[in-house]
């Protein structure tokens, strides 16, 4: 190395890391992705559920044929991610879930997709649904006709909401009794015993309880939310799965709810603080309004 005057410089040491450090740093950054629009463009703008489920045309015969091949699964295919199909498993990732998304983010569509997917892969004697829509019933209107749906509750009938909690408590006790009579430690043990015994034991379908706008319910019926926490705690081993969804999670996600919901999905939120309430990260607050259905999941 020489100076501007041409004089040679010796014993010069570069003020930079060793070559190995660059490789280490690059490998550490490789799995990380930015949050900007250019990164979001790597994902499709929309995905047809029928294409993912491979049931085109969607006939009753095609669904029944799928049931005949198994008809029992806790895996729900929800869309497409960077690495291909994106699915969640109520047992592996749950057993309970928390979902948030502001107006226009695609929350209702996500809930419908969750219910529809599980209906396709489960016979009605393997999984049932109780759907609670605290916005008035629009989100689950089509789902009410599924043979799996055993209850649809809306905010239009407060007494029915209160009765639903009593009924869920009775269902917990019934399941505990049924497992005890079969000497089964949990729902998986019971289902295995039933399969090995030629289905002599009576059916015990998993129960998916989906509540849209639970934040509004928490304000108007706080005792219902307390009851739900009890159901979440006791229902883990009984085959009961709770999905809580809201537009505005602020203040509604209590420590008890957070402790009992391992699976969390955040569509676009109004700000980064609401994103942190759900997935413990700010990212969903930066999702573009031009991308409804885009979400981050904490598994």
Task: Label every model-predicted segment.
Residues 1-26, 64-186, 199-277, 286-288:
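P-loop NTPase catalytic phosphate-binding loop
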Residues 280:
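Phosphate-coordinating loops and pocket residues in cytosolic domains that bind phosphorylated ligands
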Residues 2-54, 286-299:
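Conserved AAA+ ATPase small/helical "lid" subdomain
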Residues 49-56, 185-201:
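Amphipathic alpha-helical surface "interface" segments used
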